[in-house]
Amino acid sequence: MRVQLALNVNDIDEAVEFYSKLFDAKVSKRKPGYANFSIDEPPLKLVLFENPEAGERLNHLGVEVFDDADVHAATGRLRSAGMVSSVEDAKTCCYATQNKVWAVDPQGMRWEWYRVIEDSDTFGPARD
């Protein structure tokens, strides 16, 4: 399990260069307007969306897990707490097919608890 930080950036090339140096890490996935890093230390999934018009730099937060049982457990726990905003099964997003559950904090910050099933050649639905 690792925390995910998804950022809106003005220039994907500039951001990739900066974060590669900051974390001494190589890009795990690179597509037009998109990149992600799977960083071992500290355990972090860093996702970059080229989105210069975004009013906020923080896009959303998440927790990446590696087993569907963890997504189902999080869904049950969040549902019992009345916190589930949506559940997505086998949904393509960020050049990957994923199972996930979403919750929104009291200030409107979106959190996802997700597992990547497989890579995809397409980004998925339009970014927000």
Label the model's feature ranges.
Residues M1-D13, P43, L58-L61, I117-D128:
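N-terminal beta-strand motif that seeds the catalytic metal site of vicinal oxygen chelate
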Residues I12, G62-R110:
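Vicinal oxygen chelate
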Residues F49, Y95-A96, W102, W113-S120:
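Short beta->alpha transition motifs characteristic of CBS
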Residues K31-Y34, G55, C94-N99:
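Short acidic/glycine-enriched loop/turn segments that link adjacent beta-strands
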